[in-house]
């Protein structure tokens, strides 16, 4: 601001460094943020004005959904035209301008007055990518990433600091709205002066280069002329006559920003999913819910941890599994671990920092997709071309590296939980490998899935290695530091994909565990009924109808059934090698030893009742166990599935009913991979989002009060 004498006066500014704005953007819960992202993703139109684009909107346009349209703000037209006119006026006056009358980068000392020819050469020499033969060796960027990049580039150019013509932005918008996607090379950018090599192919398409290709709405291959005609751009191709047609299209990192936006949309959803999966893990493992108590996390102060714990606390609050587990913990408490293992007990502390990192990265990318990243920047108000470095993609490379590390940490936790879940030494009574068949010798359940999980986890941990520390000096040492943003974003996209493989496999395993707890409860009930019936028939009265001392054994016999893991004997409940029969006999023997002088009398001896009890039980128990199993399989169980009384039920219901999965056994043809594939596809399509959020619909965004 200048006074009447022409001196610049410093104007008082609020939040001049934007720290307050950055902090304000993190207000509220992460879950609310994800809900807003999902709502934005589902809007039918994206209106671009240069400053309000979101990660979710970019992800939506990337999906090639015909139901969503891109609209340009007419209010931006004047600013874009003003900067374009300024460039033309500057050139007509003979002003020396970078990229208009000069060469590029390290060769900017060269000069020319042939602005159109210079732009044409810029696009030609940057067309240096390799595509491969598209069969065994395809090096084409995913079309979703290209669409995302086009959207981001339009948005940043709309702010009117780049010198480009508005009709170019309209042409790119029409390509998007007609589902016509330029073919870009997968590799070849260091995200220094933007993603120059890949983006040159977009410029090549709209200017009619013969090597330019696009993919049409039905997957057909189009040349430049066909692409522009189908997009109804109103012309065949754009002739390269403007001195600022090529450079503004290229000088920015929209490619990496588009991919980063897609990646972070999914990463945020996966972060919430990991919280809910950890809570379900606590349910099926009969975990102690006190690990979510708010005081513990309040004393640590980290918002991500506090929210993760509060979400898990909400799922576990009132859970039928937690209520049942409380009774188990009260039984023989001195013979059981006092606390759960780290993968369960410290899951909020583990997930909290990852959520904070992913959320911070999301905000950083949203600032970037609404930034002006060109060089030079055209300041029409001051009649200046400012030569700077906003094209440097360091915020993107760093945020992608950080996000990838967070994703790897989430995957590590899921693998640790999965490993406990399938191991009968740790899983509190579930069968080894989560086998559900009648014969464990012919059913190995999730053994293959565990091997696959180890593979996924190893790859994910490798992908966590940073990219940004591998910078090489480029372009004759002009681009001697560069962000490697797109490489990092590509690796983060791979990490998201691998984490989805892990999450889908883990969710199928959790549903298997839920059904096994359901089966376990019904089998135990059948065993208790059988023991009760046999005890009453064989232990209540003596040979002459008199009451027998053995009648007092029934309570201890039922206590044995409660204490023994059902799946430790369910395949052959009367086997002498399994613990049930051994401990039932021991309970009778203990009573006999306390029977004193009565044992000398055949009419009152408990020892003499043991054989009759065991023989009768062997005749009854296998039939009762099989009948209970059949009742569960046919949908007529004596005891309903507890999951229906839990807040985690919507996710289970979606996997079982929505996707048509089932309890896996060695007796059936269906394999674990088939079920995991269904869940993975649902994750990729986004259909898992609604049941996930349904689990948390009643959460008020705060922990339970400390009482």
Curated annotation (Swiss-Prot):
Its EC number is 4.3.1.24. Pfam families: Lyase_aromatic. Contains an active site 4-methylidene-imidazol-5-one (MIO), which is formed autocatalytically by cyclization and dehydration of residues Ala-Ser-Gly. Gene3D superfamilies: Fumarase/aspartase (Central domain) (1.20.200.10), Fumarase/aspartase (N-terminal domain) (1.10.275.10), Phenylalanine ammonia-lyase 1, domain 3 (1.10.274.20). There is a cross-link at residues 192-194 (5-imidazolinone (Ala-Gly)). The modification 2,3-didehydroalanine (Ser) is found at residue 193. It is an enzyme of class 4 (lyase). InterPro entries: Aromatic_Lyase, Fumarase/histidase_N, L-Aspartase-like, Phe/His_NH3-lyase_AS, Phe_NH3-lyase, Phe_NH3-lyase_shielding_dom_sf. GO terms for cellular component: cytoplasm. Keywords: Cytoplasm, Lyase, Phenylalanine catabolism, Phenylpropanoid metabolism. Belongs to the PAL/histidase family. This is Phenylalanine ammonia-lyase. It comes from Ipomoea batatas.
């Amino acid at each position: 601001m200048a006074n009447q004498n022409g001196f610049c006066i410093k104007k008082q500014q609020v939040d001049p460094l934007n720290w307050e704005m950055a902090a304000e953007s993190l207000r509220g819960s992460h879950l609310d943020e994800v809900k807003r992202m999902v709502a934005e993703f589902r809007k039918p139109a994206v209106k671009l004005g240069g400053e309000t684009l979101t990660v979710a909107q970019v992800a939506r346009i990337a999906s090639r959904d015909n139901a969503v349209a891109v609209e340009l703000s007419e209010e931006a037209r004047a600013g874009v035209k003003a900067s374009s006119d300024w460039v033309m006026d500057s050139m007509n006056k003979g002003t020396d301008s970078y990229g208009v009358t000069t060469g590029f980068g390290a060769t900017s000392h060269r000069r020319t007055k042939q602005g159109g020819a210079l732009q044409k050469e810029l696009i030609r020499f940057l067309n240096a990518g390799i595509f491969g033969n598209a069969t065994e060796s395809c090096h084409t960027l995913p079309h979703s990433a290209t669409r995302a990049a086009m959207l981001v580039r339009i948005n940043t150019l709309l702010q009117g600091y780049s010198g480009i013509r508005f009709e170019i932005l309209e042409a790119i918008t029409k390509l998007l709205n007609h589902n016509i996607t330029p073919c870009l090379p997968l590799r070849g950018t260091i995200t220094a002066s933007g993603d120059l090599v890949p983006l040159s192919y977009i410029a090549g398409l709209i200017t009619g280069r013969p090597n330019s290709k696009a993919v049409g709405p039905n997957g057909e291959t189009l040349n430049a002329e066909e692409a522009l005609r189908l997009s109804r751009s109103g012309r065949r191709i754009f002739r390269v006559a403007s001195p600022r047609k090529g450079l503004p299209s290229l000088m920015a990192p929209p490619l990496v920003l588009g991919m980063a936006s897609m990646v972070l949309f999914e990463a945020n959803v996966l972060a919430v999913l990991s919280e809910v999966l950890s809570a379900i893990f606590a349910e099926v493992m009969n975990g102690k819910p006190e690990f979510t108590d708010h005081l513990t996390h309040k004393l640590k102060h980290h918002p991500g941890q506090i929210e993760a714990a509060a979400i898990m606390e909400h799922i576990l609050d009132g859970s039928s599994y937690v209520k049942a587990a409380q009774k188990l913990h009260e039984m023989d408490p001195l013979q059981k671990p006092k606390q759960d293992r780290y993968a369960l007990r410290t899951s909020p502390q583990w997930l909290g920092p990852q959520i904070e990192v992913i959320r911070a990265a999301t905000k950083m990318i949203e600032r970037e997709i609404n930034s002006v990243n060109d060089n030079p920047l055209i300041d029409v108000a001051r009649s200046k071309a400012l030569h700077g470095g906003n094209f440097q993609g360091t915020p993107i490379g760093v945020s992608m590296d950080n996000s990838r590390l967070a994703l790897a940490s989430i995957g590590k936790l899921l693998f640790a939980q999965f490993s406990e879940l399938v191991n009968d030494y740790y899983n509190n009574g579930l069968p080894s490998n989560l086998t559900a068949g009648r014969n464990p010798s012919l059913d190995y359940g999730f053994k293959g899935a565990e091997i696959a999980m180890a593979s996924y986890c190893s790859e994910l941990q490798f992908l966590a290695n940073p990219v940004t520390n591998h910078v090489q000096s480029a372009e004759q040492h002009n681009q001697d530091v560069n962000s490697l943003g797109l490489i990092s974003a590509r690796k983060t996209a791979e990490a998201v994909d691998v984490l989805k493989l892990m999450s889908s496999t883990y969710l199928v395993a959790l549903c298997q565990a839920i059904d096994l707890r359901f089966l376990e409860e019904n089998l135990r009930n059948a065993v208790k009924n059988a023991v009760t019936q046999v005890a009453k028939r064989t232990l209540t009265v003596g040979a002459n109808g008199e009451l027998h001392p053995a009648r007092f054994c029934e309570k201890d016999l039922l206590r044995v059934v409660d204490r023994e893991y059902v799946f430790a004997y369910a395949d052959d409940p009367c086997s002498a090698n399994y613990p049930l029969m051994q401990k039932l006999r021991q309970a009778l023997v203990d009573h006999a030893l306390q029977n004193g002088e009565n044992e000398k009398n055949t009419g009152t001896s408990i020892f003499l009742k043991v054989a009759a009890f065991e023989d009768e039980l062997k005749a009854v128990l296998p039939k009762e166990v099989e009948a209970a199993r059949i009742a569960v399989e046919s949908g007529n169980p004596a005891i309903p599935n507890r999951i229906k009384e839990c807040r985690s039920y919507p996710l289970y219901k979606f996997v079982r009913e929505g996707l048509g999965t089932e309890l896996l056994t060695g007796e059936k043809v269906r394999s674990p991979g088939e079920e995991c594939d269904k869940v993975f596809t649902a994750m990729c399509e986004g259909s898992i989002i609604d049941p996930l959020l349904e689990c948390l619909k009643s959460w008020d965004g705060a922990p339970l009060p400390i009482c």
